Amino acid sequence: MKRKQLSGKRIGIVFGTFAPMHVGHVDLITKAKRANDNVLVIVSGSNTQEDRGTRAGLSLNQRFRYVREVFYDDELVVVDKLDEAGMPAYPEGWVPWVNRVKELIAKNTDDPEKITFYVGEPEYVTELNRYYPQAQVELIERSIINISATEIRDNPMENWRFITKPFRRHFTRKVLVVGSASGGKTTLVKDLARTYNAPCSLEYAREYQEKYNVRDDELDTNDYIHLLTDQYAQTSDIIDKGQHSGLIFADTNSTVTKVYIDYYLKENISQEEFDLLDRLYQVTQAREKWDLIFVILPKSNYVDDGFRDMTMADNQTRDWFTRHLLDLLSPFKDKIVILGENSNSDSFFADNYHNAKKAIKERLHIEI
């Protein structure tokens, strides 16, 4: 739904790169809103590598969307973006920049009587007074919330409480656990999630198969479409909600589903259907961003839970599954940690838990 123009006669203007937006920014915008009728928030920058936000993986478009999301339910705040690509560097860039700001004000307001900029740098006061004398400029004190976007980018976990929820998805550390069936993936994910007080996304296929009472070897093309899309959606939802402390665990992803597709359907469906599933897998996998991937070797006993296909229980098939999984994951080999390599059957589960914690500490610098 399109936002209406800001109709107030007193408009506050707050601009910044917001890479990321933190609660100090929100505090400033809220103060500006309460001192005026409305506030126009301008997310500035570019989608080029000259922009520090873009260099940190937060493009101008992403920042714009996320800041809008922060104020989705505030009718007194409108968010727009200013693309600085092609503008000269400051100080020469002030003239085109101010002209573009004037365009955004005209676009988003209804002939306000008073415009007030809220800035944090004395230089901005001087330049805005020079190039936009019709507006007032107020130099604001730093928020009592002592944090900066630079500090957050340098150490997001330490400063997690300051990051606004939409931006948290960018900084979330995501740990994936994969492997063949009956290897202890789900148990390990649950144990790690409890230990680190983090949410987890469990294997969606199990919920799906129980709901529709369908076994592994009975899943068809339509089922796998659901498994690919819904597993991704379930995990993304946990990440996007931001109701965590910067760490989430996931049991299974699209790559595991792809191995099952290749095992069960490659020779049993039309090439057209197989290509459809492969394209869907490629799109889904490209959207997944993992910081650490645990691959569990098939050293535990294969358990018949009523849904598993017991023709996959032999060591040869389980080894093939693991090799194919590792082959598909090879583009991300720098993220992979193999669990169970040097374990025997007695120490397998204990070793996996210990080595997973060790890798999380060494790779992600996260301790209990």
Predicted regions and their residues:
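Short, structured active-site "lid" loops
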Residues: 57-73, 218-246
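The conserved Walker
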Residues: 181
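Glycine-rich phosphate-binding loop used to anchor ATP phosphates in small-molecule kinases
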Residues: 226-288
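Conserved glycine(s) of the Walker
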Residues: 184
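Charged phosphate-binding loop/patch that engages nucleotide di/tri-phosphates or the phosphate backbone
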Residues: 155-175, 331-368
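Conserved substrate/cofactor phosphate-moiety recognition/catalytic segment
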Residues: 190, 194-236
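A glycine- and Lys/Arg-enriched "phosphate-lid" helix/loop adjacent to the NTP-binding pocket
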Residues: 152, 264-327, 331-347
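Nucleotidyltransferase catalytic core that binds NTPs
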Residues: 1-173
